[in-house]
Amino acid sequence: MAHLQELQRTDFEPHLHRAGAFRLSGEGLPEPVALELVEARSLTKADPGLRRQPFGLVFRGPREPVLPQRIYRLDNPSTGPQDLFLVPIRRDDAGTYYEAIFT
């Protein structure tokens, strides 16, 4: 498992738009929830003085249930399990979208 502090946006980009590449689990979830990474973006201009460039990830999950913001276990074969704070940010016909921010 990679350390959360060491993860970079580039660790996630190979999984963009791969349905089911991520599985969400956690307390209160009866079974894992499949997520698709739909966006990986830098949050600031590159700053060589920073240990890690801040970035954001947006995942799309099923339309129902809408999961509350909290820490979930996110599993992916290449990054390993990570405990991430996810926030629901929008919902449309395709699903519910969740954001994770890395600073």
Each predicted region: which residue ranges?
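Beta-strand secondary-structure signal
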Residues: 21, 34-36, 56-58, 71-73, ...
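Short coil-to-beta-strand transition motifs
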Residues: 25-36, 76-82
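Short, compact, well-ordered microdomains
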Residues: 69-103
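N-terminal disorder-to-order initiation segments that are Gly/Lys/Arg-biased
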Residues: 2-27, 34
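A short, sequence-level motif marking secondary-structure junctions
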Residues: 36-43, 87-93
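Short, conserved turn/kink motifs that form compact alpha/beta structural patches or helix kinks used as
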Residues: 39-75
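Short solvent-exposed loop/turn micro-motifs enriched in small/polar/acidic residues
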Residues: 15-17, 65-67, 93
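A general secondary-structure signal for short beta-strands and their flanking turns/coil
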Residues: 17, 30, 52-54, 95
